[in-house]
């Protein structure tokens, strides 16, 4: 039976419906906000595995073109592989949900939110998140919900919940917040140099709406009726010889956990693991059934040692204090042929960023259901296996897309608009080493690379990854976390920004008791760390270079009247093609009359600009052109001044010193219609014979008259008068 629940969030109602679509799934919910609707389903496999130490969850958010009344572009007229946007939304759904599933369930879980309709006003991603969370909460799969999500923006001094696309575009802060009744579990977004207090207020305000949606889900569960939960596949087991393992390895492990250097530390811990494994195997205390329990017990000891040292002694595995940042080395211009490059090294994390400048032809065209877009700024993040000393395939996965998107958001508010810098900008980050915070190293390297390339950015941007170790009311915030601290800690949040404020933010919280005071302390510690990193980066490069690389395409811009665009294009594009071929330039003509020329030769580009200016310029008496003889008749020749203008050159004999008084030609003909370019006729020194003209010949002419109908009369100009 169809069940419906409605609640007001922001300017529209959020509507949940179930019991009439996808009824064979373990759970299904159709969520609607405004005119945007998403159907979310959740299913689990019937196969049970007891050897899993993780939650086998997959989220496949997908958008259908029919939702916006569109047919896919290109040759293939159906939806294909997931777009970056769909992957990013899938990650937004996955991250707050994954910790709430029980590992002991032992079955593969798949959540599929499908966008069925969009009104081009309300973004469907938030609708999809709440549809997915509610579908799982209503299902028979064990889940520690409810959770919910909202988007908050800061616009004109006010916070707006679940804003429109236009409000998002115009805002100074745009974040997606997910959480439960007890607290926040995930935050992600970008900003235009906002302060920490604004971010905190946005998160705090978002939680109030999240609690409303969570309570609505509980009410909806009462309406629909609770399903009997599926049984857990296995009970959590403990290695039966855990105490003996502790006695055997704990003291040595405490030393191994604090060996300097990631590779050395990993090697020392692995040696102890192998030694312990061999010892217990020799005692015949290890079997196939408890081998995984042995490794879990060993990992628990390592986690206990590291967390205890941080909480009680303020000492981290690499010897740093909680707020200490690793040594930083920065370089720029290390690649000679690229348009801009920078190498940023922080401890054992290293990122090489390379900036390339292109033309408007290089813009990325986004064919999305919320409207076609053209991106002129892109950041691509690569994480090759050698960065962590491993082998593997070179491929772009969801992690790479997510990290690249975070770094791009951190930098894009500092990148100038197309009107100020009409280049397409692509930044590629190659992570060469990784031991935590590679996405924030990408932000730092990317910022310096943009400056190296001469992109007039508004300010230098740095990023830092923060962590948290807590126990009860006691907590320690960590600056510039290592990979193991991310894994063993209670919170991972990344903050990027300038000296003036935050530009990018991502936070994942594994515990529920994160207070506002704790978050304020963490953000302040992150701000201090960010300023420290910026000070080091600024010693290498603090402002954008004046001018761009000699290897980058050159740009010349000019503005013409809109009604003259057709003159520049010409019949069937003939005129603009001639300019392109003759001067070896690319010509971009915009609807507002702005013309952008791209090329490699400054001289040819200037000549192309002059040609366009001559095409659109209104002719005036006295101006000189180099024209082409197009047609000759018994009275004279028609001279093409520009592809859109012709003048007439009379070939009749004229007195060399004739004056035209008040006649049609006025007093502008100083010598003759031929400007002295003809020859005297024998026996008639006062008359001049016109020079011989041929069609296609290039000659210099001067405008001597323009009548009221726009007809242009010309005379030949001698070289010395030109």
UniProtKB/Swiss-Prot annotation:
Family: Belongs to the polyribonucleotide nucleotidyltransferase family.
Name of the gene encoding the protein in the UniProt record: pnp
Keyword Nucleotidyltransferase: yes
Gene Ontology CC annotations of this record: cytosol
EC identifiers of the protein: 2.7.7.8
One Pfam family it belongs to: KH_1
Gene Ontology molecular function: 3'-5'-RNA exonuclease activity; magnesium ion binding; polyribonucleotide nucleotidyltransferase activity; RNA binding
Source taxonomy: Bacteria, Pseudomonadati, Spirochaetota, Spirochaetia, Spirochaetales
Cofactor: Mg(2+)
PROSITE patterns: KH_TYPE_1, S1
Domain annotation KH: ranges: 553-612
Record keywords, A-Z: Cytoplasm, Magnesium, Metal-binding, Nucleotidyltransferase, RNA-binding, Transferase
Organism: Borreliella burgdorferi (strain ZS7)
Name assigned to this protein: Polyribonucleotide nucleotidyltransferase
Role: Involved in mRNA degradation. Catalyzes the phosphorolysis of single-stranded polyribonucleotides processively in the 3'- to 5'-direction.
Main subcellular location of this protein, as a coarse class: cytoplasm
Keyword Transferase: yes
CDD domains to which the protein is assigned, alphabetical: KH-I_PNPase (cd02393), RNase_PH_PNPase_1 (cd11363), RNase_PH_PNPase_2 (cd11364)
Residue span(s) of domain S1 motif: 622-717
């Amino acid at each position: 039976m169809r069940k419906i629940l409605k609640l007001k969030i922001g300017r529209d109602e959020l509507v949940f419906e179930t019991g009439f679509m996808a009824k064979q799934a373990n759970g299904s919910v159709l969520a609607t906000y405004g005119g945007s609707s998403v159907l979310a389903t959740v299913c689990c496999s019937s196969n049970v595995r007891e050897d899993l130490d993780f939650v086998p969850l997959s989220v496949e958010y997908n958008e259908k073109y029919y939702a916006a009344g569109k047919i896919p572009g290109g040759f293939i007229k159906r939806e294909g592989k997931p777009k970056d946007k769909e992957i990013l939304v899938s990650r937004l759904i996955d991250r707050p949900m994954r910790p709430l599933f029980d590992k002991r369930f032992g079955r593969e879980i798949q959540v599929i939110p499908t966008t069925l309709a969009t009104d081009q006003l309300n973004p469907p991603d938030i609708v999809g998140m709440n549809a997915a969370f509610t579908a799982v909460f209503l299902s028979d799969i064990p889940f520690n919900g409810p959770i919910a999500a909202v988007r908050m923006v800061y616009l004109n001094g006010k916070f707006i919940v679940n804003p429109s696309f236009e409000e998002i575009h115009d805002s100074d802060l745009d974040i997606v917040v997910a959480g439960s009744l007890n607290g926040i579990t995930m935050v992600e977004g970008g900003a235009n140099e906002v302060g920490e207090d604004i971010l905190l207020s946005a998160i705090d305000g978002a939680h109030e709406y999240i609690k409303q949606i969570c309570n609505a889900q509980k009410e909806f569960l009462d309406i629909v009726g609770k399903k009997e939960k599926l049984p857990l596949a296995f009970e959590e087991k403990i290695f039966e010889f855990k105490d003996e393992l502790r006695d055997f390895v704990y003291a040595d492990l405490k030393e191994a956990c604090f060996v300097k250097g990631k590779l050395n530390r990993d090697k020392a811990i692995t040696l102890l693991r192998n030694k312990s494994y061999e010892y217990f195997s020799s005692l015949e205390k290890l079997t196939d059934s408890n081998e995984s329990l042995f490794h879990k017990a060993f990992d628990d000891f390592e986690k206990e040692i590291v967390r205890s040292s941080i909480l009680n002694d303020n000492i981290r595995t690499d010897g740093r204090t909680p707020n200490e940042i690793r040594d930083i080395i920065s370089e720029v211009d290390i690649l000679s042929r690229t348009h801009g490059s920078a190498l940023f090294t922080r401890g054992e994390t290293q990122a090489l960023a390379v900036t390339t400048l292109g033309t408007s032809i290089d813009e990325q065209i986004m064919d999305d259901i919320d409207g076609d877009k053209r991106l002129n700024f892109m950041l691509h993040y690569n994480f090759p296996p050698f960065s962590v000393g491993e082998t593997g395939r070179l491929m772009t996965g969801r992690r790479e897309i997510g990290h690249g998107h975070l770094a791009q958001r951190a930098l894009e508010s500092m990148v100038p608009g197309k009107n100020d810098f009409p280049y397409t900008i692509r930044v590629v980050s190659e992570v060469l080493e990784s031991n935590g915070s590679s996405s924030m190293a990408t932000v730092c390297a990317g910022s310096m690379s943009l400056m190296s390339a001469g992109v007039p950015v508004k300010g230098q941007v740095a990023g830092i990854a923060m962590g948290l170790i807590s126990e009860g009311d006691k907590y320690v915030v960590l600056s510039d976390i290592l990979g193991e601290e991310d894994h063993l800690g209670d919170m991972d949040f990344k903050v990027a920004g300038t000296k003036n404020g935050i530009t990018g933010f991502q936070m994942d919280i594994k515990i529920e008791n994160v207070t506002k005071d704790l978050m304020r302390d963490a953000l302040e510690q992150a701000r201090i760390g960010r300023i420290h990193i910026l000070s080091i980066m600024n010693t290498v490069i603090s402002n954008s270079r004046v001018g761009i690389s000699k290897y980058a395409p050159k740009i010349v811009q000019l503005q013409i009247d809109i009604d003259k665009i057709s003159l520049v294009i010409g019949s069937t594009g003939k005129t603009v093609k001639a300019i392109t071929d003759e001067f070896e330039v690319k010509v971009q003509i915009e609807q507002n009359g702005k013309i952008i020329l791209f090329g490699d030769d400054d001289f040819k580009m200037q000549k192309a600009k002059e040609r366009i200016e001559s095409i659109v310029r209104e002719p005036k008496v006295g101006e000189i052109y180099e024209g082409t003889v197009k047609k000759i008749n018994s009275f004279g020749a028609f001279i093409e001044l520009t592809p859109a203008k012709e003048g007439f050159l009379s070939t009749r004999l004229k007195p060399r010193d004739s004056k035209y008084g008040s006649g049609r030609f006025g007093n502008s003909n100083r010598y003759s219609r031929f400007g002295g370019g003809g020859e005297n006729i024998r026996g008639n020194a006062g008359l001049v014979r016109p020079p011989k003209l041929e069609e296609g010949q290039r000659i210099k002419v001067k405008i001597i008259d323009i009548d009221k109908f726009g007809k242009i009369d010309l005379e030949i100009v001698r070289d010395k008068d030109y």
